[in-house]
Amino acid sequence: MADILVVEDEDNIATALDFLLSRDGHKHRRMATGAGALEEIRASHPDLVLLDVMLPDVSGYQIVQDVRADPALNDVRVLLMTARGSVVERRKGLALGADGFIAKPFELSELRAELARLLGGRC
């Protein structure tokens, strides 16, 4: 199973993600703010980061840019999550280097499909 870092400030979404990831056997942990997220990504080198775009202290877009600027993190997958699921937002996230984009609220089956796509055999 995969090692996943969840960066999400909304408790109800974080709880749903915890339920899904635990049930599917993934190792995961949560950060509620962007502060320290990049350091955690560098230190733990997760397989995937589930990253909220609208964090209270830093934009998820900035974190994606920082991850993609570090060659040592090229294999870390990033799935952006946002309540603003417009085509413009999706294009922006993907252009900055995100591997996927999912609009909140999402169905668990939709998230599972994205996890399978991004993680391949580790899902």
Predicted regions and their residues:
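Conserved acidic carboxylate
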Residues: 8
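Two-component/phosphorelay signaling modules centered on CheY-like receiver
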Residues: 11-29, 118
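Alpha4 helix (beta4-alpha4-beta5 surface) of REC/receiver domains from two-component response regulators
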Residues: 18, 62, 85-100, 113
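Acidic, metal-coordinating helix/loop segments flanking the phosphotransfer/catalytic sites
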Residues: 30-48
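Acidic catalytic/metal-coordinating carboxylates
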Residues: 33, 59-65
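The feature encodes the CheY-like receiver
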Residues: 56, 74, 86
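C-terminal output helix
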Residues: 106-116
